[in-house]
């Protein structure tokens, strides 16, 4: 029995009913990776020996009817900027090549406690800076729907592995769209939770006021199951929130009659491709047929999202990445003959082009002569963007729109044009700036490449997002398409 495209929910039932052993599931996953990943290139490191050992231990517990854990026996792939004790965590950078952590991230502790099985680490844009997974030092992941196309980024490996049926779920991180955009490009479900919903302890920091870990899956309910497992306050992360409600599944099947949905006119404006507009408009009609009330609204400061995001994120990155200096860990230049040379050469040689670009931008924005003109002004714009959402949410339950302005572009098409690449974040960065939850679900295809629909919710109201996304998924999904890839 092949379980390659089985859902998390179905796998849990099969294991609970003893129709399949965790070790059989893990074997099937590694067989699929061996067959498919030389083409997709989603994994950077595999943890096969430990995974098989863990699965065999779970077999014994299964035989004793001791199947504790929300994700008992479920295989998982983890983005390579999330710390995994004893397994390489490189952030897809030469700077951290062969770096093996000696502690565990909070999300990994939670997943291990729920008896999920770590399969390996997934490719990404270097230090999560990029929108195509092409800035990875190690390899370029391809889109399972079209091998000429990018999978999106920065969590491109996480999205591609799920779409290709290599793992039933993965974790990514989202700073300005890095879960939702690759989810849209690869036709899977990706959730960026509310800022503070999931602990960031053990996530290698890019922009600390924006970063958030979230799940990628092939359906909405699976996504909700995984988020339940990783949510919660953490003493090791002072920005994590104490929120009691982490039940995202019990009401997921509830209808959406009367739900008030806002469609911002800016989300279907300039820069959004016609095929994407058409798919989203069709999705809106579907929501109406399900009983939702959809009305046009305005989020007037949307256009300032990209410039303010790139100033703030780059400024925080220039500070966070200052720790990589060639001294304590990471790449150490062998050609340096003084301390100053060691700093300069280790960072110049260890970081890639895009990472250095953002460090330069952030350092400039924080410099004394430009701080007020760039960083301070961007923070003021951030407040305006948040206020726009607050005003809309006084009268509406959910905001809907495209996840990305286009479908996936071709490999090599935009990598040398950073401004065009940054423009792809038009519809995702405002959600991070406002600290809100956002989920991307498939809503169509154009020339064989998936289109993503984004739902944005009130702070800590992931439950409503899952409900509306689940109901929409009953009318449109790609479940029958994955196996044909």
From Swiss-Prot:
It catalyses: L-glutamyl-tRNA(Gln) + L-glutamine + ATP + H2O = L-glutaminyl-tRNA(Gln) + L-glutamate + ADP + phosphate + H(+). PANTHER family: GLUTAMYL-TRNA(GLN) AMIDOTRANSFERASE SUBUNIT A, TRANSAMIDASE. Heterotrimer of A, B and C subunits. Gene3D superfamilies: Amidase signature (AS) domain. Keywords: ATP-binding, Ligase, Nucleotide-binding, Protein biosynthesis. The active site is at residues 79, 154, 178. Belongs to the amidase family. GatA subfamily. Its EC number is 6.3.5.7. It comes from Staphylococcus aureus (strain bovine RF122 / ET3-1). InterPro entries: Amidase, Amidase_CS, Amidase_dom, AS_sf, GatA. This is Glutamyl-tRNA(Gln) amidotransferase subunit A. Allows the formation of correctly charged Gln-tRNA(Gln) through the transamidation of misacylated Glu-tRNA(Gln) in organisms which lack glutaminyl-tRNA synthetase. The reaction takes place in the presence of glutamine and ATP through an activated gamma-phospho-Glu-tRNA(Gln). GO terms for molecular function: ATP binding; glutaminyl-tRNA synthase (glutamine-hydrolyzing) activity. GO terms for cellular component: glutamyl-tRNA(Gln) amidotransferase complex. GO terms for biological process: translation.
């Amino acid at each position: 029995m092949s379980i390659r495209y089985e859902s998390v929910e179905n796998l849990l039932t099969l294991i609970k009913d003893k129709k399949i052993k965790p070790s059989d599931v893990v074997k099937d996953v590694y067989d699929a990776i061996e067959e498919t990943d030389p083409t997709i290139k989603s994994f950077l490191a595999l943890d096969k020996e430990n995974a098989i050992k863990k699965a065999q231990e779970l077999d014994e517990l299964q035989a004793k009817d001791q199947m504790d854990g929300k994700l008992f026996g479920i295989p998982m792939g983890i983005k390579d900027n999330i710390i995994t004790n004893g397994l390489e965590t490189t952030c897809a950078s030469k700077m951290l090549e062969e770096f093996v952590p000696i502690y565990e991230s909070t999300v990994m502790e939670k997943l291990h406690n729920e008896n999920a099985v770590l399969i390996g680490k997934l490719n990404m844009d270097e230090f999560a800076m990029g929108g195509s997974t092409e800035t990875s030092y190690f390899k370029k992941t391809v889109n399972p729907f079209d091998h000429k196309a990018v999978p999106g980024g920065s969590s491109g490996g996480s999205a591609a592995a799920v779409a290709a049926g290599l793992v039933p779920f993965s974790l990514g991180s989202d700073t300005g769209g890095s879960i939702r955009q690759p989810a849209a490009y690869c036709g899977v479900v990706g959730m960026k939770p509310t800022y503070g919903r999931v602990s960031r302890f053990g996530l290698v920091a890019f922009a600390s006021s924006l970063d958030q870990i979230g799940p990628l899956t092939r359906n909405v309910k699976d996504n909700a199951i995984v988020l339940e497992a990783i949510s919660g306050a953490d003493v090791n992360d002072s920005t994590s929130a104490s929120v009691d409600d982490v039940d995202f599944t019990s009401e997921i099947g509830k209808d959406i009659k009367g739900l008030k949905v806002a469609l911002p006119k800016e989300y279907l404006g300039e820069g959004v491709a016609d095929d994407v507009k058409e798919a989203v408009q069709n999705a809106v009609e579907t929501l109406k047929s399900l009983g939702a009330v959809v009305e046009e609204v305005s989020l007037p400061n949307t256009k300032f999202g990209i410039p303010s995001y790139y100033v703030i994120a780059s400024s925080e990155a220039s500070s966070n990445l200052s720790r990589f200096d060639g001294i304590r860990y990471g790449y150490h230049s062998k050609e340096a003959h003084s301390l100053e040379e060691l700093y300069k050469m280790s960072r110049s040689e260890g970081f890639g082009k895009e990472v250095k670009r953002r460090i330069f931008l952030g350092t400039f924005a924080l410099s004394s002569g430009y701080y007020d003109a760039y960083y301070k002004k961007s923070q003021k714009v951030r407040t305006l963007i948040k206020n726009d959402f607050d005003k809309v949410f006084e009268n509406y339950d959910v905001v809907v729109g495209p996840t990305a302005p286009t479908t996936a572009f071709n490999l090599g098409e935009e990598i040398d044009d950073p401004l065009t690449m940054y423009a792809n974040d038009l519809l995702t960065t405002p959600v991070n700036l406002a600290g809100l939850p956002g989920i991307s679900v498939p809503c169509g295809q154009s020339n064989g490449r998936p289109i993503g629909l984004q739902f944005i919710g009130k702070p800590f109201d992931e439950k409503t997002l899952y409900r509306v996304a689940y109901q929409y998924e009953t009318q449109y999904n790609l479940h029958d398409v994955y196996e044909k890839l």
